[in-house]
Amino acid sequence: MTAEVTPARIGLLIDHLNEKGGYDENILPSLRLVADDYVACGILERPVEFVVRAVQGLPKGSFRPVRDAFYELVDEDALVIFGPWVSENGVALRRYVEALAQVPIITMAASETMLGEWVFGLPAGSMEEEPIIMATVAALDGCRSVGLAFEDSLIGREYLRTTREACCDAGLTITAEISIPQVESDKRVAMATLAADKPDAIMHVGFGLGIVGMNAALEAIGWMPPRYTTTAFEFAATGPWWREQLAGWIGLDQYDERNQVGQEFLDRFQAEHGHRPEYFFPVYCYDIARLMMTALATARPLTGPAVKEALERIKMLPAASGAPGTRLRFGKFIRHGWVGSEFLVARRVLPDASRSVLHATIEGLVEPPDAPPPSAASMRS
């Protein structure tokens, strides 16, 4: 009688929970769909089991549960870990991952300071690159001056440094800088400070929770300029309330409906689950899952160190995220997984908060047939 095969275990370290204490319902179905495909095709010789640890880390919670979750996943025999998601937790966790030197992790956090021998990044953005793209898009829209609101946090201040440089390079004058709390707060005084010099637009940088209330504050002071943000914009995909907070905003995202790799995955997802989640996270999960499955399938032997080496061998895998032509790869000294200038795109939430539309990439403006992008002048009120 043949002994039962032990599943290859993948850890999910989820460090940001929603107001109900949960997380995106499409994450696990997306990951499992890829795992099942690899097993069915014979690429993987054993089943895959996902072990989840979902905790409230920084900024709403604390770092310790994140650290504990990492060690628990290692003890559960995870061969690779997806997470954490938030830069403040990732930067703090790096030393523990590197000291243990047993299991590679792949983070979606945007700070390059957390990357290392055992820490790979497929970031939902990049603190070094997001400001360059954001400033370029603002300049393409005709802006020449901006007021800058930054969250007073590790993330916000790292963004602040790179945004100053990006605005200078794009020919944008920063008329004022104002720090805002990383959590919800009254923004009227801060917005009035930015409004004093009447810049062409305002920019927000940070994790994203600080953006809550900015629209209401701007409306209260009677000033609604063009508004730009980083991948904090991706909160718009989580539901109507967040789309209201981001109504009229232009921000960075990873969902591009023109990407056929992503659309083909969504076709399969819809056929399997009966609905079509047309936003960044499912296609991102398709990308991260293929990286992990490929590494598990090619690791010899099937251990954490061998999985790390297998990740380093992945080259030019077509990505479902980003604009068409985006690809995935790691390397011996390469820990940033995206290839291509358009791995991030700019989208815009419509004024009625009903949905977002494609707006631009770093290479130029994009005009959706049913929602042409406004000029900077027409966006002002």
Regions found by a protein language model. Name each.
Residues 1-381:
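Extracytosolic ligand-binding ectodomains
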